């Protein structure tokens, strides 16, 4: 199945660089077309990739949950979210109620693709209703960075 995917046209579209010039068969030699990021952002996940369900932790103490969320916010696997979420958590997490902490936990662990969180927070894509919560609105406000705080590294622990 993997071999079929690797040699399919869908995989070639995924691997093509974001702003790489390419020529179509109908174009002349002096005319070059460019692929824009918006054409690449919206690829659907292949149906053969199962996404495991995140395990719920109903009996987890609030302080333990906050410590786990602090760690998970700093270790996302993509620098953009590492910076946004770690600075957001450093600013707000200690003041979150149990309900707000649960909303934040659902946001960062319920979504299977970190790029979705990034696009929703930067308002590149509309936020689905189930994630359009008070915490998401706070995150969007944080991302706007109206105080013009420099966020080039994660805050100290």
From Swiss-Prot:
The keyword Transit peptide applies. It comes from the Eukaryota. Its main location: mitochondrion. It holds the Pfam family Sdh5. SUPFAM superfamilies: YgfY-like (SSF109910). It is found in: Mitochondrion matrix. InterPro entries: SDH, SDH_sf, SDHAF2. GO terms for cellular component: mitochondrial matrix; mitochondrion. Coiled coil: none annotated. Keywords: Chaperone, Mitochondrion, Transit peptide. One of its GO terms (biological process) is mitochondrial respiratory chain complex II assembly. Residues 1-24 form a transit peptide. HAMAP family: SDHAF2. Interacts with the flavoprotein subunit within the SDH catalytic dimer. Belongs to the SDHAF2 family. Plays an essential role in the assembly of succinate dehydrogenase (SDH), an enzyme complex (also referred to as respiratory complex II) that is a component of both the tricarboxylic acid (TCA) cycle and the mitochondrial electron transport chain, and which couples the oxidation of succinate to fumarate with the reduction of ubiquinone (coenzyme Q) to ubiquinol. Required for flavinylation (covalent attachment of FAD) of the flavoprotein subunit of the SDH catalytic dimer. This is Succinate dehydrogenase assembly factor 2-B, mitochondrial. It comes from Drosophila persimilis (Fruit fly). The lineage of its organism: Eukaryota, Metazoa, Ecdysozoa, Arthropoda, Hexapoda.
């Amino acid at each position: 199945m993997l071999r079929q995917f690797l040699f399919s046209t869908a995989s070639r579209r995924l691997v093509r660089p974001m702003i790489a010039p390419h020529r179509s068969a109908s174009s002349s030699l002096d005319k070059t077309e460019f692929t824009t990021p918006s054409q690449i952002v919206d690829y659907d996940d292949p149906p053969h990739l199962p996404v495991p369900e995140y395990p719920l932790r109903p009996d987890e103490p609030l302080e333990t949950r906050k410590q786990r969320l602090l760690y998970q916010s700093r270790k996302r696997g993509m620098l953009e979210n590492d910076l946004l979420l770690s600075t957001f958590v450093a600013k707000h997490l200690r003041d979150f109620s149990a309900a707000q902490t649960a909303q934040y936990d659902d946001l960062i662990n319920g979504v299977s693709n970190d790029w979705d969180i990034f696009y929703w927070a930067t308002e590149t894509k509309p936020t689905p209703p189930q994630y359009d919560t008070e915490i998401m609105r706070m995150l969007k406000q944080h991302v706007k960075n109206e105080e013009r705080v420099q966020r080039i590294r994660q805050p100290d622990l």
